[in-house]
């Protein structure tokens, strides 16, 4: 991040800097949909790293006049992604493995990558002169166990899921408030069930 910023301040025409941050910065303190101006309370090393990057970006903006756009991404998923919960669920359930970490009651906000791309385009097109911080999510929460059950149904699996409840440095509930995102005349089009269905079609195709 710092290398990009150091290069940017040397340019005659200062570029806008777009940074993909994370809603994990909000931490464990909230159970309602989280607004961009709420206090940041990161608990994981990943979130702390994102927080550090945001601080550097905003400092450079203050000192050098760079225009900064910070996008705080929810849980992004979609065809091609080979990590995170949905991919992990496909891998385990298709191979009759049933162990998942956590309680299953953790709540996350899922946004399909195509909806994210549409929002990023809208934000860039606005060409605001001011710095912006925008939540990028669906505004809806889904329990981990419900996501896994959707995957199970897609695989016609009757496997019984077992949760190993270990202490993890990750928030229990993360749901974004997307009022600001919607002000760009944007709204998510792909709901979680449709998104997972399309994802599993892709997953089965690459594993055929």
Describe these PLM feature segments.
Residues 93-208:
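C-terminal substrate-binding subdomain of Rossmann-fold SDR/epimerase-dehydratase oxidoreductases
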Residues 52-56, 60, 89, 147, ...:
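Hydrophobic alpha-helix immediately C-terminal to the catalytic Tyr-X-X-X-Lys motif of short-chain
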């Amino acid at each position: 991040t710092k290398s990009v910023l150091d290069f940017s301040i040397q340019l005659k025409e200062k570029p806008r800097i777009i940074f993909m941050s994370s809603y994990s910065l909000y931490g464990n303190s909230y159970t309602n949909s989280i607004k961009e101006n709420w206090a940041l309370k990161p608990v994981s090393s990943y979130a702390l790293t994102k927080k550090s990057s945001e601080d550097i970006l905003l400092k450079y903006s203050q000192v050098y006049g760079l225009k900064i756009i910070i996008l705080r991404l929810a849980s992004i998923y979609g065809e091609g992604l080979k990590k995170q919960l949905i991919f992990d669920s496909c891998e385990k359930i298709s191979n009759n493995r049933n162990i998942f970490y956590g309680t299953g009651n953790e709540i996350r906000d899922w946004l399909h990558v195509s909806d994210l791309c549409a929002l990023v385009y809208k934000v860039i097109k606005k060409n605001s002169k001011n710095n912006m911080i925008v939540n990028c999510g669906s505004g809806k929460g889904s329990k981990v166990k419900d996501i896994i059950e959707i995957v199970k149904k897609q695989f016609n699996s009757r496997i019984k899921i077992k949760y190993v409840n270990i202490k993890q440095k990750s928030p229990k509930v993360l749901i974004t408030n997307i009022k600001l995102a919607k002000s760009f005349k944007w709204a998510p089009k792909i709901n979680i069930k449709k998104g997972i269905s399309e994802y599993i079609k892709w997953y089965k195709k690459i594993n055929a």
